[in-house]
């Protein structure tokens, strides 16, 4: 008799995706982040569901309802901080996952990569609307500043902003619709993640060498299930340490002040995971130019498959490209730091140089270096 997991229509799908999936035997721990992102998404949906049971999306009561969750709901403070810090863990895993994809040439899987870029946009949108919900000072002013950027669009800009706001300023209508978006988007992310996996399993996973490994595949279970469990335990440990020992480490103290349209915070800045994009936005003195640069800083990822000029897929055997990759990582860390600093000398010029370097690396230096490496390899 054939095993039920190989015959039952539903079990067969799970079996082909997580049990009997042929996997390269040499993938490193950098390949753990996909499953960790799945875990983060589950944690966020569960904690978010319990928060939604007690939260009220109304300007008069939103801030109080979050306080009520922390003070009066059984373990409400744990759920709230797991959700807030879970978002940070989500982005850490996301950026590591993308960095691994860039380094090892995973963008050769065009469909998988493009769905990944769409996923990144969706996750960023979810995090943005979610940050508005506690209705603190930074929530309110962050929403005002970022939505206002759309007014830079010629002709329809102002109308578009007022349409998103549901009025002439960020108010009750804005908060209500942002809550609705924040509730629906994670399920859209889940659907996209499944599509991401479907496309990945069409080709099979890449591996550190970038060389096809069809002749050397091993079953996903038990080898990689156990490896993923180790990663999951480390992720949960880090999240719990953050939540229980330093819950406000990555947050902004301004968000403990209720939203006040009459008082602007000294420094309006997003959560740490958006600071690199915020720094690029601020580095251009023109509003429309800044908005375009902000969009392009993420959209440029969709161009990476077309900018891949090397004859080798992975950077494993390409030392010059490796160097530029780590320069890019350092540049993004610099931009993240600059995004959190006030707009004054020398931060402005450093931010502008880091922004130029970011686009220069991806669009010019890395493709040209790959061509030079091709020549050095006497191909």
UniProtKB/Swiss-Prot annotation:
Entry's Gene Ontology BP terms: mitochondrial electron transport, ubiquinol to cytochrome c
Signal is among the record's keywords: no
Cofactor binding mode and count: Binds 2 heme b groups non-covalently.
Cofactor: heme b
GO molecular function: metal ion binding; ubiquinol-cytochrome-c reductase activity
One Pfam family, short name: Cytochrome_B
Entries under InterPro entries matching the protein: Cyt_b/b6_C, Cyt_b/b6_C_sf, Cyt_b/b6_N, Cytb/b6-like_sf, Cytochrome_b, Cytochrome_b_C_euk/bac, Cytochrome_b_N_euk/bac, Di-haem_cyt_TM
Keywords: Electron transport, Heme, Iron, Membrane, Metal-binding, Mitochondrion, Mitochondrion inner membrane, Respiratory chain, Transmembrane, Transmembrane helix, Transport, Ubiquinone
Membrane topology of the entry: Multi-pass membrane protein
Transmembrane segments: 33-53, 77-98, 113-133, 178-198, 226-246, 288-308, 320-340, 347-367
Subcellular location: Mitochondrion inner membrane
Domain of life from the UniProt record: Eukaryota
Binding positions for heme b b566 per the UniProt entry: 97, 196
One GO location term (cellular component): respiratory chain complex III
Free-text function comment from the UniProt entry: Component of the ubiquinol-cytochrome c reductase complex (complex III or cytochrome b-c1 complex) that is part of the mitochondrial respiratory chain. The b-c1 complex mediates electron transfer from ubiquinol to cytochrome c. Contributes to the generation of a proton gradient across the mitochondrial membrane that is then used for ATP synthesis.
Protein family per UniProt: Belongs to the cytochrome b family.
Alphabetized PANTHER family for the sequence: CYTOCHROME B (PTHR19271:SF16)
Other known facts: Heme 1 (or BL or b562) is low-potential and absorbs at about 562 nm, and heme 2 (or BH or b566) is high-potential and absorbs at about 566 nm.
Protein's name in the database: Cytochrome b
Organism: Balaenoptera musculus
Taxonomic placement: Eukaryota, Metazoa, Chordata, Craniata, Vertebrata
């Amino acid at each position: 008799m054939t095993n039920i997991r190989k015959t039952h229509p539903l079990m067969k799908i799970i079996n082909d995706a997580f049990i009997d999936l042929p996997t390269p035997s040499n993938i490193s721990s950098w390949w753990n982040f996909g499953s960790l992102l799945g875990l983060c998404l589950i944690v966020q949906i569960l904690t978010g569901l319990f928060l939604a049971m007690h939260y009220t999306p109304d300007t008069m009561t939103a801030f109080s309802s979050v306080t009520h969750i922390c003070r009066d709901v059984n373990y409400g403070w744990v759920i709230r901080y797991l959700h807030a810090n879970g978002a940070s863990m989500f982005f850490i895993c996301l950026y590591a996952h993308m960095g691994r994809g860039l380094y090892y040439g995973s963008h050769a899987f065009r469909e998988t990569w493009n769905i990944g870029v769409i996923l990144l946009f969706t996750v960023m949108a979810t995090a943005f609307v979610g940050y508005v919900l506690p209705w603190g000072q930074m929530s309110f002013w962050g929403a005002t500043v970022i939505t206002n950027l759309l007014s830079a669009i010629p002709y329809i800009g102002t109308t578009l902003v007022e349409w998103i706001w549901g009025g002439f300023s960020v108010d009750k209508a804005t908060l209500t619709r942002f809550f609705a978006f924040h509730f629906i988007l994670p399920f859209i992310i889940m659907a996209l993640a499944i599509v991401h996996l479907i496309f990945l399993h069409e080709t099979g996973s890449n591996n550190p060498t970038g060389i096809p490994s069809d002749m050397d595949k091993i079953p996903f279970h038990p080898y990689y299930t156990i490896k993923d469990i180790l990663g999951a335990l480390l992720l949960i440990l880090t999240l719990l340490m953050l939540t229980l020992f330093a819950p406000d480490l990555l947050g902004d103290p301004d968000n403990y002040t209720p939203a006040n349209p009459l008082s602007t915070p000294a420094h309006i800045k997003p959560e740490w995971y958006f600071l690199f994009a915020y720094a690029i936005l601020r580095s251009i003195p023109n509003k429309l130019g800044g908005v375009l640069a902000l969009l392009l800083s993420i959209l440029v990822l969709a161009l990476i498959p077309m900018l891949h000029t090397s004859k080798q897929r992975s950077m494993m055997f390409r030392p010059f490209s490796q160097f530029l990759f780590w320069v890019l990582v350092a540049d993004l860390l610099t931009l993240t730091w600059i995004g959190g600093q006030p707009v004054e000398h020398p931060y402005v010029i450093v931010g502008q140089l880091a922004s130029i370097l970011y686009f220069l690396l991806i669009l010019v230096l890395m493709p040209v270096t790959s061509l030079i490496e091709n020549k050095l390899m006497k191909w």
